[in-house]
A protein has these predicted regions:
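N-terminal leader/targeting and accessory segments in enzymes
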Residues: 1-79, 83, 330-335, 360-374, ...
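Residue-level signal for inorganic ion chemistry
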Residues: 27, 46, 80, 95, ...
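Active-site beta-alpha connecting loops in nucleotide-dependent enzymes
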Residues: 32-37, 295-298, 314-386, 415
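Acidic, Mg2+-coordinating active-site environments of NTP-dependent enzymes
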Residues: 57-64, 170-309, 334-335, 359-369, ...
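Phosphate-binding loop of NTP-binding sites
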Residues: 63, 76-206, 210, 214-223, ...
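ATP-dependent carboxylate/acyl-activation modules
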Residues: 95, 297-299, 417, 421-422
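Peripheral docking tails and interdomain loops at the edges
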Residues: 408-425
Length: 427
């Protein structure tokens, strides 16, 4: 069966699924092998739950004529997504970067949806499985697709671009994320820049923050749409940016008051403004869209718990995002501040060095209480008044049980694996 034949069957279905727990009537189920399971074994169950067709790559689990047997289910999912993207032929905006991908994607989506029927990556489904699923969620009614791409190794962005074939691209930044897989910061720059390489070779467009030296230099010869706080020749000149704690931006003749905390979110907003402007979304609609966006999922959320005001930024962390979050917190005009920060994952052999750098940064720049949670921070323990180190989250909770934190402004930030949002239960 050709990929076109498979696509014809897919078009008869309402949606694609890889999880029998979420099967809906008339789904198109693709059995993907995972680390702990083989979804081929769920093919019969998928059909019983209402799937119209199932794709498998193990003949032992063939059910009936509704079963599509292929050599590799994952490769078929990816090829199907690529074929579907070409079939729809709609403009696609791709974005990647070390920090801020998901927030920027959501901002772009709310802005463009003021004028267009848009579809965007759900959550952070941004890998070799998530990107195909995103593309397969697009329909003939979709006018613009927004695809987030994540990577922790070389060649991943290149591969995802070959599937999604974006017409526009934006890289949020190049930072110290996934150093273990990329082999250092230079590896991060090389890996993320694979998007630039694809766009350049296919004569496509890039959105560029001219104030980011790496972005600016790498895109000089590209077809680019730009923004800047310093260069008035940029496509969109950002006149003024403030944050205390929420970001306010003046540009295109309006002042935009966001619900996003910290100057580190300013460029996420600026990118969405620039992309909206390029697609001729009225400035009043751009302003309304950004002002209506409220972050969730532990991303720069401002919460109140008891007597404490909390900046919850516990979805993820790396050295770059940790420093900018701490810099912003230090500058906040608040009294009785305290930070609760957790280990940063996937840093490889640089992990202890990077955790030590964060400890030293706070040692030199803070005069408030600091709680460090996790084995790599614990390995860099120092003696300093108001500094507290905990080997595990459970050790930290024991402390919280004995000393109540009250009337404080708190920053909570750590890698996803630390799940520091659990702290809220004990405040």
């Amino acid at each position: 069966m050709t990929i076109q034949n498979i696509h014809d069957l897919f078009l008869k279905c309402s949606k694609v699924s890889i999880d029998t727990r979420k099967i809906e009537t008339n789904s198109f189920f693709v059995a993907i092998k995972g680390d702990r399971f083989d979804a081929n074994t769920f093919a019969k169950e998928a059909l019983e739950k209402g799937a119209s067709f199932v794709v498998i790559d193990n003949a032992n689990y063939y059910v009936d004529e509704r079963t599509i047997l292929v050599n590799d289910s994952l490769e078929t999912l990816q090829e199907l997504a690529k074929f579907h993207r070409q079939f729809l032929s709609l403009p696609i905006i791709a974005l990647t970067g070390s920090n801020g991908k998901t927030t920027t994607k959501e901002l772009i989506n709310v802005v463009l949806s003021k004028k267009f029927n848009t579809k965007a990556t759900v959550g952070n489904l941004n890998n070799h499985i998530g990107v195909p699923l995103t593309l397969l969620s697009f329909t003939k009614e979709t006018q613009i697709g927004i695809v987030e791409m994540g990577a922790n190794h070389q060649k991943e962005i290149e591969f995802l671009c070959e599937i999604a074939q974006p017409d526009y691209g934006y890289i949020t930044n190049f930072g110290k994320a996934h150093l273990e897989g990329f082999g250092g910061v230079e590896g991060v720059i090389k890996g993320k820049s694979e998007m630039y390489t694809y766009l350049k070779s296919n004569n496509k467009f890039v959105f560029v923050n001219l104030d980011d030296k790496i972005q600016s230099q790498k895109s000089v010869t590209f077809k680019r749409i730009t923004f800047s706080q310093n260069d008035k020749s940029a496509t969109v000149f950002i006149e003024n940016v403030m944050a205390n704690p929420f970001v306010k931006i003046k540009t295109l003749g309006v002042e935009i008051n966001s619900h996003l905390i910290g100057l580190y979110n300013a460029n996420n907003i600026n990118a969405a403004i620039t992309i909206g402007h390029h697609f001729e979304v009225p400035v009043s609609d751009i302003k309304a869209a950004i002002e209506s966006y409220v972050p969730e999922n532990n991303r720069s959320q401002l919460l109140t718990k008891g007597t404490n005001e909390i900046i919850l930024d516990a979805y993820n962390a790396n050295p770059s995002s940790m420093v900018v979050a701490l810099e912003n917190f230090i500058q906040l005009d608040k009294t009785n501040k305290s930070v609760i920060i957790g280990d940063m994952y996937e840093l490889g052999e640089e992990s202890l060095v990077e955790h030590k750098a964060i400890v030293n940064f706070l040692k030199n720049n803070s005069d408030f209480e600091c709680h460090f949670v996790g084995k790599d921070f614990f390995a860099n323990s120092i003696q300093k008044e108001n500094f507290h180190f905990y080997h595990t989250f459970e050790d930290f909770i024991k402390f919280l049980s004995s000393v109540k934190l009250e009337h404080k402004t708190l920053l909570i930030k750590g890698s996803r694996g630390m799940a520091l949002e659990r702290t809220l239960e004990y405040l």
